[in-house]
Curated annotation (Swiss-Prot):
InterPro entries for this protein: Acetald_propionald_DH-rel, Ald_DH/histidinol_DH, Ald_DH_C, Ald_DH_N, Aldehyde_DH_dom
UniProt superkingdom: Bacteria
Taxonomic source organism: Salmonella typhimurium (strain LT2 / SGSC1412 / ATCC 700720)
Region of interest called Targets protein to the BMC, as start-end residue ranges on this chain: 1-19
Principal subcellular localisation of the protein: other
Upper classification of the organism: Bacteria, Pseudomonadati, Pseudomonadota, Gammaproteobacteria, Enterobacterales
Comment, domains: The first 21 residues target foreign proteins (tested with eGFP) to the BMC in E.coli. The cargo is only detected by Western blot in broken shells, strongly suggesting this protein is normally found inside the BMC and not on its exterior.
Keywords: Bacterial microcompartment, NAD, Oxidoreductase, Virulence
Protein EC: 1.2.1.10
Top enzyme category: oxidoreductase
The protein's name: Acetaldehyde dehydrogenase (acetylating) EutE
Length: 467
């Protein structure tokens, strides 16, 4: 028999092995259920098949291949459905999650021995985990969470943002199909056909689900905190500042800042949101940025743009971002005030004071405020202020070790990038693993399978110490 014949036999056997007590059949595609109860029941049954580490490895390998194979399809669908972001950048995110999310290799048991015997500490699954995913990074978050949670031995009930339900459901279906085709359990990843706020709130309290993973903005994290007493791992908002001092490699800094601040139209919470630059190099840095497909706005143009992009500005200068403009292309934003920019424009930037609404608010669009300061000490202090205690991400461009050390200590973020774009902290151009769930509100930071296990201790007294 050739490989194709074997695959056909495996599929036929799997079909015969389906449990006749399986809940109401999925709607639309594999893993998408008409009701939440049916989805959770299917995920519970599927999770029983993950007790074997070999099965987890098989499922993860299939998910990696499917995630990469369908990365562009999912990127195009995400932009088409949500209107946010850039296809090429979403493609890069999807591929990065498929390749760079750690699997079972990052889970190691601990063994302690001593005069009183042996203690074994194992990584146990939670069982069925609920995952709330955003409209900004829909497919990438599904791929990332699927790998991390399955590696930890869990099945997943996804609650995708309603504005990205089609692409989220498509991703869930494609990954499920790949797992089943490889010989894994059906419905390791499930969701409902019509996700909404009520579905998410039910998941926050659903019996038998012990862990909630929430990736999104302040509102959804606050809602999860209010509506659940379950273990919560939450990824929230950020307002990442990037500081450039007088010692920086300015051409490199300009390239990195434009790349990072424009990546996927700035809808990743880890993207650069405000640039703080020492006055002596500010003009040259901005000139170099204009050579990287960035367009500088005048103060008058920024004044025109502000009421289009922000509403309800409070006494601190923080506004409510208009959802109509989140993640939109720089050219479309410029056109809103009658400004024509070159087609290849990736970023708009404008000089502002430190208290300007563009600097204070997490904009999540390719509009970057630039604030001049007298020296690096002032720059670092302002970066801490504008980061706002989110403890998310920050960056610095400098060739002075003392300056970088000073900012690293002061900024207190989960990710701090030196001499590169902020996305390098997520494995996109930097070393280390990747994730779409950066859990700053609950303190886990850059998540992996290790984040999603329960530690269990087993003790044998007065035995099995062999030295």
């Amino acid at each position: 028999m050739n490989q194709q014949d074997i695959e056909q036999v495996v599929k036929a056997v799997l079909l015969k092995m389906k449990d006749s007590s399986q809940p109401a059949s999925t709607v639309h595609e594999m893993g998408v259920f008409a009701s939440l109860d049916d989805a959770v029941a299917a995920a519970k049954r599927a999770q029983q098949g993950l007790k074997s580490v070999a099965m987890r490895q098989l499922a993860i390998h299939a998910i990696r291949e499917a995630g990469e194979k369908h990365a562009r399809e999912l990127a195009e669908l995400a932009v088409s459905e949500t209107g946010m972001g850039r296809v090429d950048d979403k493609f890069a995110k999807n591929v990065a999650q498929a390749r760079g999310t750690p699997g079972v290799e990052c889970l190691s048991p601990q063994v302690l021995t001593g005069d009183n015997g042996l203690t074994l500490i194992e990584n146990a699954p939670w069982g069925v985990v609920a995952s709330v995913t955003p409209s900004t990074n829909p497919a990438a978050t599904v791929i990332n969470n699927a790998i991390s949670l399955i590696a930890a031995g869990n099945s997943v009930v996804f609650a995708p943002h309603p504005a990205a339900k089609k692409v989220s459901q498509r991703a869930i279906t494609l990954l499920n199909q790949a797992v089943v085709a490889a010989g894994g359990p059906e419905n390791l990843l499930v969701t409902v056909a019509n996700p909404d706020i009520e579905t998410a709130q039910r998941l926050f309290k659903y019996p038998g689900i012990g862990l909630l993973v929430v990736t999104g903005g302040e509102a959804v994290v606050d809602a999860a905190r209010k509506h659940t007493n379950k273990r919560l791992i939450a990824a929230g908002a950020g307002n990442p500042p990037v500081v450039v001092d007088e010692t920086a490699d300015l051409p490199r800094a300009a390239q990195s800042i434009v790349k990072g601040a424009s990546f996927d139209n700035n809808i990743i919470c880890a993207d650069e949101k405000v640039l703080i630059v020492v006055d002596s190099v500010a003009d040259e840095l901005m000139r170099l940025m204009e050579g990287q497909h960035a367009v500088k706005l005048t103060a008058a143009q920024a004044e025109q743009l502000q009421p289009v992009l922000l509403k309800n500005i409070d006494e601190r200068g923080k506004g409510t971002v208009s959802r109509d403009w989140v993640g939109r292309d720089a050219g479309k934003i410029a056109a809103a005030i009658g400004l024509n920019v070159p087609d290849q424009t990736r970023l708009l930037f404008v000089e502002t004071p430190a208290n300007h609404p563009f600097a204070v608010t997490e904009m999540m669009m390719p509009v970057l405020p630039v604030v001049r300061v007298a020296n690096v000490e002032e720059a670092i202090a302002l970066a801490v202020q504008l980061e706002g205690g989110c403890h998310h991400t920050a960056a610095m461009h400098s060739r002075n070790i003392d300056n970088m050390n000073q900012m690293a200590n002061a900024i207190d973020t989960s990710i701090f990038v030196k001499n590169g774009p902020c996305i390098a902290g997520l494995g996109l151009g930097g070393e280390g693993w990747t994730t779409m769930t950066i859990t700053t509100p609950t303190g886990e930071g850059v998540t992996s399978a290790r984040t999603f296990v329960r530690l269990r201790r087993c003790v044998l007294v007065d035995a099995f110490r062999i030295v």
